[in-house]
């Protein structure tokens, strides 16, 4: 079994706290469904630290949000946040990609966009199915929530998560226009 490094554990703690606290704020778009800018945290931390960190930040952070908010822990949605964080972290495993070192190409950005979008869709469908099957929620309510949450998460991912991650990578790019004279 791989051990988690101290750096990774700290990143998971910070990411979970940020995601958990920022998850308390959002804009209502459907019954119990919000556009939450906190989703960008999963994109950035997943890209920086990988799928395991993304998974744990999503799980822990969403549990923190639900606990502080006082509406009870909705495990289907907690797991869906973990799934989203996990898929956002796939990009970190690509050879040549590093937000920390500013190394990436257009293929990496496309890969992050595609895996992120697929992860969001899978995660939200899972949460909806979980609510219907396990929690006994009405189908028509869940359809509205799933559609609203998918649209909201895609918007946050494309407008905040992806650009912030690319911006961090660009700012860390190791390049210079200076030339060494011989």
Curated annotation (Swiss-Prot):
Principal subcellular localisation of the protein? membrane
Q: How does this chain sit within the bilayer? A: Multi-pass membrane protein
What InterPro entries does the annotation carry? ECF_substrate-spec-like, UPF0397
> Do you know which NCBIfam families this protein is assigned to?
PRK13661.1 (NF010182)
Q: Where in the cell is it found?
A: Cell membrane
The answer to keyword Nucleus applying to this record is no
- Superkingdom to which the source organism belongs: Bacteria
Q: Which GO terms describe its cellular component?
A: plasma membrane
Q: What is the protein's name according to its record?
A: UPF0397 protein BCAH820_2657
Q: Does the keyword Cytoplasm apply?
A: no
Q: Sorted alphabetically, which HAMAP family does this protein's record hold?
A: UPF0397
Bilayer-crossing regions: 9-29, 40-60, 71-91, 114-134, 142-162
Which family does the similarity line name?
A: Belongs to the UPF0397 family.
Q: Name one Pfam family in it.
A: ECF-ribofla_trS
Q: Which organism is it from?
A: Bacillus cereus (strain AH820)
Arranged from A to Z, the UniProt key words for this protein are: Cell membrane, Membrane, Transmembrane, Transmembrane helix
């Amino acid at each position: 079994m791989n051990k988690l490094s101290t750096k990774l554990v700290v990143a998971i703690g910070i990411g979970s706290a940020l995601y958990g606290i920022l998850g308390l704020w959002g804009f209502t778009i459907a019954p119990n469904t919000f556009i939450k800018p906190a989703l960008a945290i999963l994109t950035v931390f997943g890209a920086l630290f990988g799928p395991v960190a993304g998974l744990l930040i999503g799980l822990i952070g969403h549990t923190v949000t639900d606990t502080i908010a006082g509406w009870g822990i909705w495990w289907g949605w907690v797991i869906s946040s973990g799934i989203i964080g996990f898929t956002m972290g796939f990009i970190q495993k690509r050879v040549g990609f590093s937000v920390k070192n500013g190394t990436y190409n257009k293929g990496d950005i496309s890969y992050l966009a595609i895996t992120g979008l697929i992860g969001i869709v899978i995660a939200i469908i899972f949460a909806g199915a979980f609510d219907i099957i396990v929690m006994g929620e009405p189908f028509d309510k869940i359809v509205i929530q799933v559609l609203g949450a998918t649209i909201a998460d895609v918007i946050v991912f494309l407008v905040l998560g992806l650009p912030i991650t690319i911006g961090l990578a660009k700012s860390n790019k190791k390049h210079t226009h200076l030339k060494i004279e011989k």
